[in-house]
């Protein structure tokens, strides 16, 4: 991570409107990962990440920050829902599977990077195998036959091979079918009960390694053969042991886990029965966040320096309802603000791939023009804010519902009206949505 905090915030600004406190907090946390790695090993061991707790209503950008952060991090990153996990002893996934999944992400990232480095060598090897299939090598003669007689044949064969190589690189043979030997991959999935994912994964790995030693003959088009053989050759060239050790080190030093919906595992006041397992999940999470050692199929992983970012709406429970030990492990608290009508106007127009741009480009594929006026966008934002205010406040997600309702007729008829166009202004928005927005009973069910 070589980006400065200011650059990280600027990048997040392209996709997320407002919420500067949250952006600054995650930007500083990301940069601190880089700063720590510049220190000596002894001091580096003593510096632990400051975990972040993001608090705010639904639809204000918590999950979107996580999504964009994963693109910027350049490090093993995993986003999980806290509600997917159960206390040890209950049916479901245990929290240690978070670290196992994070290691899987790291191994995949490291392998992809290693494969990119050997891509040109792998492509050359794949090309030779395809040429061997197109021009089978000449069979050897009788024992003791003079080698001098073989040389003209070799030259002739080499010239033919060069001609085919040129055609192959120009794409002239892409659709020709050839028969090649490829590794046989298992065509079955091992199913296991909840909580046994690690054992199932190991069994799957054993079966895959056994079957990968065998090969089978397949008839493929040349372009498909080049791709499949290229992948095979790349897999032969990379060092799997090196990939695993690099991935484990990357997880331990730079791993980031984003825990969404953490408020859903808070025990509610006066609740009995199944709610007991909510507190159990928190207590199971505690060792991971504090720092522990987790066994994975690639080796042991220490979680001491993994950064945890948690988020939740906390509209029923409060952050203080988390078990005290877990509260203490999230020292940085960031509150995200509810969105206003002005924020909705900005969300509809400013971000990269904004909603208005998405619908415009979608209908452009039908040769149908769609444009929005400023007053049309303002009216859309006002209606979204009003509906949120009167019924359940779901933040920016309300805009998706309203846009779909607004453009339902246009999207349906666009195919029959190619070459035409429409401008969405305030009058059009009122015509389509005003009655629904004003009728509280209807807006609850439709918008």
UniProtKB/Swiss-Prot annotation:
Alphabetized, the UniProt keywords read: ATP-binding, Chaperone, Cytoplasm, Nucleotide-binding, Stress response
Q: Which Gene3D superfamilies match?
A: 1.10.8.60, DNA helicase RuvA subunit, C-terminal domain (1.10.8.10), P-loop containing nucleotide triphosphate hydrolases (3.40.50.300)
Compositional bias (Basic and acidic residues) spans?
A: 148-159
Q: What is its main location?
A: cytoplasm
> What GO cellular component term, any one, is given?
HslUV protease complex
Keyword Thylakoid on this protein? no
- A Pfam family that this protein carries is AAA
Q: Name one GO biological process term.
A: protein unfolding
Q: Tell whether Cytoplasm is among the UniProt keywords.
A: yes
Annotated stretches, region: Disordered: 136-160
Q: Where in the cell is it found?
A: Cytoplasm
InterPro entries for this protein: AAA+_ATPase (IPR003593), ATP-dep_Clp_protease_ClpX (IPR050052), ATPase_AAA_core (IPR003959), Clp_ATPase_C (IPR019489), HslU (IPR004491), P-loop_NTPase (IPR027417)
One of the entry's Gene Ontology molecular-function terms is:
peptidase activity
PANTHER family, A to Z: ATP-DEPENDENT CLP PROTEASE ATP-BINDING SUBUNIT CLPX-LIKE, MITOCHONDRIAL-RELATED (PTHR48102), ATP-DEPENDENT PROTEASE ATPASE SUBUNIT HSLU (PTHR48102:SF3)
Q: Which family does it belong to?
A: Belongs to the ClpX chaperone family. HslU subfamily.
- Quaternary state and interactors: A double ring-shaped homohexamer of HslV is capped on each side by a ring-shaped HslU homohexamer. The assembly of the HslU/HslV complex is dependent on binding of ATP.
Role, per record: ATPase subunit of a proteasome-like degradation complex; this subunit has chaperone activity. The binding of ATP and its subsequent hydrolysis by HslU are essential for unfolding of protein substrates subsequently hydrolyzed by HslV. HslU recognizes the N-terminal part of its protein substrates and unfolds these before they are guided to HslV for hydrolysis.
Q: Please give the name of this protein.
A: ATP-dependent protease ATPase subunit HslU
